[in-house]
């Protein structure tokens, strides 16, 4: 069996994915691994032999602490889809040739649904050829849609940013004595966890989002307009949070109603965008109200300055837990978070077979959603509040947060 470890990051980044990388690296060193390699741009980089020695890059004092609070993917990312089993055998042979060349015994991949698909295919291929390399997935996605885990590292920080931004937009939207609607577009294709985080803004000091539109509930433009109109009779200035993935009962994305060209990625996912602009235009045309469209876009996944310290810590710990599992002989699994209690918030870790996770999605339970009023019920708030708890204290340099940059 190989003596070295290799780790990669894949898919969309988060502001805590590097904390998981730090956890993997730290635990590997604790287990006595001499060389910990990093794949530049995920498995796609491995195929191009773009591999770096993290032992040299991260062993200096202070590097891991800085890495934990650096947003985006330190190693770079990819959206490379491995071929199905039995197809393009040469791709798998090239990957395992590279792993043998670096004497790899432990393979860790930090990512979401598509990244777990990679762990599934590589661990299955390893079993097929009799390889003893251990493949373990480390969860990551702001979308919070991985199954068999209470929540996904990255979600808590994104939710904290969204809740914070909604509070600030509510304050901004009320400064003029006129009717206005600010439509805020938030990421989320099939699962509305991110958009639901707008509900966290409501408190004694903030009205919060007046409406929250989620992809779990079919979108009816007429019902939407009627609800906006009714609410404006009570409160002239509204903030509406809408998922980029909201779709009609006919399964048509609302952003497509604006006649935007539709493109797809390597995994067949439609590129979304323009939902807020379409809805703000619809409101302006039908209700003659001032409107503004705001797209949070990539800000919601890289705002490390307002990250949740709970999220940062859990991300590090789940990376370390994945390494511990590999050294216990586990392979073809994903490390997952298991909530023990809400108050006080206690969360531990467990393993799940990758076949039960890859290519599946977890959506918000429908009984947590008030579809008629475009609101979230208390169970969601009890679920999400602990995940945004505690504040980070990043290192600053010349008045701005300092990050760890990989020299190419």
Placement of each model-derived feature along the sequence:
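N-terminal phosphate-binding or glycine-rich loops at protein starts, especially the Walker A/P-loop
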Residues: 1-52
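Short glycine-rich or small-residue beta-strand-to-loop segments that form or flank ligand, phosphate
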Residues: 4-14, 73-79, 105-111, 137, ...
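Short, ordered loop/turn segments at secondary-structure junctions
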Residues: 10-12, 39-45, 79-80, 112-113, ...
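Accessory alpha-helical/coil subdomains and C-terminal extensions
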Residues: 36, 98, 106-111, 117-129, ...
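C-terminal non-catalytic interaction/assembly regions of soluble proteins
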Residues: 256-408
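Short glycine/serine/threonine-rich phosphate/pyrophosphate-binding segments
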Residues: 14-24, 46-47, 89-93, 113-121, ...
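Gly-rich Lys/Arg/Thr-decorated short loops/hinges at beta-loop-alpha junctions or inter-strand turns
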Residues: 4-7, 67-81, 140-150, 178-180, ...
């Amino acid at each position: 069996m190989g003596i070295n470890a290799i780790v990669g990051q894949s898919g969309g980044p988060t502001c805590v994915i590097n904390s998981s990388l730090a956890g993997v690296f730290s635990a590997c060193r604790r287990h006595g691994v001499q060389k910990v390699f990093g794949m530049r741009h995920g498995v796609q980089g491995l195929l191009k032999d773009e591999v770096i020695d993290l032992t040299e890059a991260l062993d200096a004092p202070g590097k891991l602490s800085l890495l934990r609070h650096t947003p985006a993917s330190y190693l770079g990312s990819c959206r490379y889809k491995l071929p199905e089993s039995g197809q393009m055998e040469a791709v798998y042979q090239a990957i395992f040739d590279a792993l043998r060349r670096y004497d790899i015994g432990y393979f860790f991949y930090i990512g979401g649904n598509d990244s777990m698909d990679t762990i599934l295919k590589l661990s299955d291929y390893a079993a097929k050829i009799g390889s003893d390399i251990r493949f373990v997935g480390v969860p990551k996605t702001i979308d919070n849609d991985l199954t068999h885990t209470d929540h996904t590292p990255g979600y808590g920080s994104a939710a904290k940013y969204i809740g914070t931004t909604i509070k600030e937009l509510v304050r901004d939207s009320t400064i003029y004595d006129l009717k206005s609607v600010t439509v805020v577009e938030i990421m989320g294709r099939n699962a509305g966890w991110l958009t639901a985080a707008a509900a966290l803004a409501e408190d004694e000091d903030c009205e919060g989002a007046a409406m929250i539109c989620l992809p779990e509930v079919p979108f009816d433009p007429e019902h939407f307009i009627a609800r906006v109109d009714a609410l404006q009779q009570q409160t002239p200035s509204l903030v509406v949070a809408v998922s980029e993935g909201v779709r009609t009962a006919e399964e048509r994305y609302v952003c497509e109603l604006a006649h935007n060209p539709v493109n797809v990625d390597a995994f067949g996912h439609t590129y979304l965008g323009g939902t807020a602009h379409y809805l703000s235009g619809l409101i302006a045309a039908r209700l003659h109200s001032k409107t503004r469209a705001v797209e949070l876009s990539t800000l919601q996944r890289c705002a490390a300055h307002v990250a949740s310290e709970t999220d940062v810590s859990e991300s590090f710990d789940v990376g370390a837990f994945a390494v511990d599992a590999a050294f216990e002989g586990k392979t073809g699994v994903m490390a997952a978070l298991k909530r023990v209690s809400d108050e006080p918030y206690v969360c531990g870790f467990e393993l799940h077979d990758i076949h039960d996770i890859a290519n599946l999605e977890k959506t918000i339970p429908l009984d947590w959603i008030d579809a008629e009023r475009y609101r979230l019920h208390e169970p969601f708030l009890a679920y999400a509040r602990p995940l945004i708890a505690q504040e980070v204290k990043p290192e600053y340099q010349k008045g701005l947060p300092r990050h760890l940059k990989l020299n190419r």
